[in-house]
Every structure is written in structure tokens, then in C-alpha cells.
UniProtKB/Swiss-Prot annotation:
Keywords: Copper, Melanin biosynthesis, Metal-binding, Monooxygenase, Oxidoreductase, Secreted, Zymogen. The keyword Aminoacyl-tRNA synthetase does not apply. Signal peptide: none annotated. Hemocytes and plasma. One of its GO terms (molecular function) is metal ion binding. One of its GO terms (cellular component) is extracellular region. It comes from Sarcophaga argyrostoma (Flesh fly). This is Phenoloxidase 3. InterPro entries: Di-copper_centre_dom_sf (IPR008922), Hemocyanin/hexamerin (IPR013788), Hemocyanin/hexamerin_mid_dom (IPR000896). The keyword Oxidoreductase applies. Cu cation binds at H3, H29. This is a copper-containing oxidase that functions in the formation of pigments such as melanins and other polyphenolic compounds. Catalyzes the rate-limiting conversions of tyrosine to DOPA, DOPA to DOPA-quinone and possibly 5,6 dihydroxyindole to indole-5'6 quinone. It catalyses: 2 L-dopa + O2 = 2 L-dopaquinone + 2 H2O; L-tyrosine + O2 = L-dopaquinone + H2O.
Length: 71
């Protein structure tokens, strides 16, 4: 969605050179992450007999791979 609204190679630079563009980028991604941390998402996971979402606090810790498509 972000790259459709603010295309990198826009023919008219006035489309992508917006004031507060970084703030909008941060807000959009914060909303996406909030969706995964919401109780609604945990309710969906719990109804499918899955564990709650684990918080990701340590940025130095490696992320466990949950899916490997080339198996």
C-alpha cells in the first residue's frame, strides 16, 4: 500500500515529496504492528489452539524461523 501511495519512481515529484512523509510511514507501520499485538489477534490464535503472540523486545536476539517454503 505504501509504495502505491508514494511510488519511488513517480513522474511528478510533488506526489512523493510530501511534508510529514516519515511520520505517515511510521504511523502506517505502527498500526500494522498494533494489529498483531491486539487482543483480537490473540483471540483468533487461541480459538485455533495456538499460543499467544510472544513480545519481541530484544533486537539482538535472532528470530526463530516459523516457515520454510523449500522443504
Amino acid at each position: 500500500h505504501w509504495h502505491l501511495v508514494y511510488p519511488i519512481e513517480a513522474p511528478d515529484r510533488s506526489i512523493v515529496d510530501k511534508d510529514r512523509r516519515g511520520e505517515l510511514f511510521y504511523y502506517m507501520h505502527q498500526q500494522i504492528i498494533a494489529r498483531y499485538n491486539a487482543e483480537r489477534y490473540n483471540a483468533e490464535r487461541l480459538s485455533n489452539h495456538m499460543a499467544r503472540v510472544q513480545p519481541f523486545n530484544n533486537l539482538d536476539e535472532p528470530i526463530a524461523e516459523g516457515y520454510f517454503p523449500k522443504m
